[in-house]
Design a protein with these regions (language model features):
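Glycine-rich, acidic and aromatic/proline-enriched surface loops and short helix-turn segments
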Residues: 44
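Terminal, compositionally biased segments used for targeting/anchoring and flexible tails
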Residues: 5-16, 20-27, 39-41, 60-68, ...
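Zn2+-dependent metallopeptidase catalytic domains
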Residues: 50-51
């Protein structure tokens, strides 16, 4: 990260010039899923607030640019807990060392295949070296994962959260949340009354079809139209309707997307393969801790007669953020 970036701080609203957006969105590791689940659980229980998390993240200084997204959240959560007196550094260090020890698995000296005497019957065969050696090519957990485990264990011991809270949240992000937005859009495509309700009062409309969003933030639905293209960003951090769409993609959290989409949205959309005519208006909607957006894409013309289940299968996350449109 350049000194220019550090000087500008973590929230650069429209200050970057055409830095290409990395569209790759790698699958989250277990460590990342656990860290994310812990953060969501403690904020949903009001043990901490998103404003506190953001404040402490901004206070990280140059370290903000030197560590990753989940590590920043973990470090900020730890600092909040210390400041609030939830635990002290001595207890944290003790529990952290215990967690590190739990991953300290001794290496086993396996036999040399050339010295093995075969006592079993069968067709003559040989063993490959890989049959007798451990696979040590995999990477262990990153350092911040030990911090995450320590924070979680302390909070569990204090009765603030449970193990089940975390495992349930991981499962929801894997299997529940990513499908909710698809369900909502499919119903809006098939039910004009619901579509109007969704546009007028999205949060209540979604609640009325049995989806509990588990968020304090309001939801605003913006329908794409022939005259206007809508796209969503969070210039401040990474606010996103997680309980409706799942985790935000990596590019959504990236500095290049957050800064560029504000002042050159047409170029950004082109990088996603979405070409918006010059005579069509583009509206960029900035999410925050109190307000999240859902973009309602146009229904494909070749789907007449489809039911909601069929429609939900063709709804993609990128449509609901506004970076892409259905064919």
């Amino acid at each position: 990260m350049s000194q220019k970036h550090k000087k500008m701080g973590p929230h650069d609203v429209g200050g970057e010039n055409s830095i290409p957006i990395d569209l790759n969105d790698p699958e989250m590791t277990h460590w990342e899923k656990y860290a994310n689940a812990l953060r969501i659980v403690v904020s949903s229980k009001r043990i901490i607030t998103l404003d506190e998390l953001r404040y402490h993240t901004e206070k990280l200084g140059d370290a903000y640019f030197e560590i990753g997204y989940f590590e920043r959240n973990c470090l900020s959560l730890h600092n909040i807990c210390i400041n609030k007196g939830i635990y002290n550094e001595e207890l944290f260090s003790k529990v952290r060392l215990k967690k590190i020890a739990e991953f300290d698995v001794p290496k086993i000296n396996l036999p040399d295949p050339n010295t093995i005497e075969h006592l079993h019957d069968g067709v003559p065969h040989s063993h490959e070296v890989s049959d007798f050696q451990e696979d040590e090519t995999g990477e262990g957990p990153p350092d911040y994962y030990y911090d995450t485990l320590a924070i979680a264990e302390i909070m569990i011991e204090l009765g603030l959260i449970t193990k089940e809270d975390i495992t349930q949240k991981i499962d929801q992000f894997d299997n529940v949340f990513p499908n909710r937005g698809k369900t909502v859009v499919a119903k809006a495509w098939n039910d004009e009354d619901f579509r109007q309700y969704l546009i007028e009062d999205a949060k209540n409309a979604i609640s009325n079809i049995g989806i509990k969003l588990e968020t304090f933030a309001d939801i605003i639905c913006m329908p794409q139209s022939p005259e206007t293209h809508h796209i969503v960003v969070c210039t401040l951090c990474s606010c996103y309707p997680r309980t409706l769409l799942g985790m935000p993609p990596s590019w959504y959290k990236s500095r290049s997307y957050r800064s560029r989409v504000v002042h050159e949205p047409r170029k950004v959309l082109a990088e996603f393969g979405t070409i918006v005519p010059e005579n069509k208006e583009i509206k960029v909607h900035d999410s925050n801790a109190d307000m999240r957006y859902l973009i309602l894409p146009p229904r494909p013309s070749n789907t007449n007669g489809w039911n909601e289940e069929q429609l939900s299968e063709i709804v993609e996350r990128d449509y609901l953020v506004g970076v892409r449109l259905p064919d």
